[in-house]
């Protein structure tokens, strides 16, 4: 059986690895080399037959699991280098077992993404209710757990996250104090606190994470902003009040395609007639697909990064208007590279909170996600949404003017 598994994996790698070099030491101690180049290069040891069997059957899930369980070990390189070789090659297709599993995942997608209120809260808790200290060890000081914005390209993480908030605020057109803002998926409160402190807004932030809620409320109190910012444990579907502005950053990925009509109907119901909303989310260039099985199992259950075509149809059907759309291409790759380096620098402290297997899981997640944006057709889209065409000026000049004129601290402690 072991010989058969080796033959099958050899066929997969021979067909897949066309660029760079990939070396494998098999469970029996023999070795093979794949590819016809020198870079990128990586080498691994597949240490046991169980890991090999799982990777032959379902590599999209099993490669990550094998790394977590030390059934697959990088040799004189990092998992980031291993994934660089693999993803640079399989992005061109030609791996039948991966394509078959992807087709099956697409068929099952409506059931996997049926994120009702109960399931949505459970899914959020899976990732966002982890020990809060973990995130402080690799995020910026403001705990912005979403794509930063690099207008120059050489910003620090703190500078880029501040630029992201400034960029979004400009699109919200916060042109007067005391505008009411709904922040859907408010996280640890950084966006809401910035909009209140620097733009005089009155913000309601909603989240399904109890850990994030407690931290956000504590930050509001410590900043003296509790009279302007209110955080609630609430599903977006339960909101009834109307707001001047609505912002949602990094939350839409958890909604699920079957719930997009409800999401946009909620935006329309809760946005005042002359209001402005801004949706910031991960998307994909290559059309509708399915979430990687490993990511769905270990990181974001129920999560999905849609094609823009999947988003615009239900938005238009709701009667809302897309006033402005911007695609941010490599900004998240740069953000994730910062997170990956910070995680590596604090790995011992993180292992003390959890364990080595958890660290390998997170390393795989951060590296795989970064490479998805560099090599695998992922991007960020920002959609400015209105109910009335006259809610914003005729040209984008007002965004640039406000963004240039706005200065605030890179991060709020």
Regions found by a protein language model. Give the residues of each.
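Conserved beta-strand signature within the Rossmann-like core of class I S-adenosyl-L-methionine
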Residues: 274-282
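A short glycine-rich, Lys/Arg-flanked "PGG" loop and its adjoining helix->strand segment in the class I
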Residues: 261-274
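Conserved SAM-binding loop of SAM-dependent methyltransferases across substrates and taxa
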Residues: 188-199
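Substrate-binding/catalytic lobe of Class I Rossmann-like enzymes that use SAM or dcSAM, i.e.
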Residues: 282-393, 407
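A short acidic, Gly/Pro-enriched loop at the edge of an enzyme's catalytic core
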Residues: 237-246
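Conserved class I S-adenosyl-L-methionine
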Residues: 177-185
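Feature captures hydrophobic
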Residues: 1-155, 159-161, 167, 174
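Conserved SAM-binding loop
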Residues: 216-217
């Amino acid at each position: 059986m072991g010989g058969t598994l080796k033959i099958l994996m050899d066929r997969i790698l021979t067909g897949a690895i066309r660029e760079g070099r990939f070396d494998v030491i098999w469970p029996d101690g023999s070795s093979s080399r794949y590819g016809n180049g020198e870079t990128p290069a990586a080498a691994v040891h597949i240490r046991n037959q169980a890991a090999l069997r799982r990777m032959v059957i379902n590599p999209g899930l099993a490669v990550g699991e094998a790394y977590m369980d030390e059934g697959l070990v990088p040799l004189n390189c990092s998992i980031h280098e291993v994934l660089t070789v693999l993803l640079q090659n399989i992005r061109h297709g030609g791996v039948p077992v991966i394509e078959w599993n992807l087709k099956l995942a697409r068929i099952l997608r409506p059931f996997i993404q049926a994120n009702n209120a109960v399931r949505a809260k459970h899914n959020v808790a899976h990732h966002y209710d982890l020990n809060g200290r973990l995130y402080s060890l690799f995020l910026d000081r403001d705990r912005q757990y979403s794509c930063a914005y690099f207008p120059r390209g050489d910003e620090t993480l703190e500078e880029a996250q501040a630029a992201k908030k400034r960029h979004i605020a400009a699109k919200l057109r916060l042109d007067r104090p005391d505008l009411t803002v709904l922040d859907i998926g408010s996280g640890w409160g950084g966006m809401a606190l910035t909009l209140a402190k620097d733009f005089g807004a009155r913000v309601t932030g909603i989240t399904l994470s109890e850990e994030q809620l407690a931290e956000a409320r504590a930050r509001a109190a410590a900043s003296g902003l509790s009279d302007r910012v209110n955080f609630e444990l609430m599903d977006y579907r339960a909101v009834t009040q109307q707001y001047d502005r609505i912002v949602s950053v990094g939350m839409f990925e958890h909604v699920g395609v079957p719930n997009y009509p409800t999401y946009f109907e909620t935006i329309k119901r809760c946005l005042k007639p002359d209001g402005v909303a801004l949706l910031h989310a991960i998307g994909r260039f290559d059309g509708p697909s399915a979430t990687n099985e490993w990511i769905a199992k270990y990181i974001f259950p129920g999560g999905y990064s849609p094609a823009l075509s999947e988003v615009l149809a239900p938005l238009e059907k709701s009667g809302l208007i897309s006033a402005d759309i911007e695609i941010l291409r490599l900004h998240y790759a740069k953000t994730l590279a910062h997170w990956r380096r910070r995680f590596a620098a604090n790995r011992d402290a993180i292992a003390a909170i959890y364990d080595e297997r958890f660290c390998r899981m997170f390393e795989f997640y951060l590296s795989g996600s970064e490479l998805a944006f560099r090599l695998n057709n992922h991007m960020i889209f920002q959609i400015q949404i209105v109910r009335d065409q006259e809610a914003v000026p005729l040209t984008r000049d007002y965004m640039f003017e406000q963004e240039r004129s706005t200065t605030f601290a890179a991060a709020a402690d």
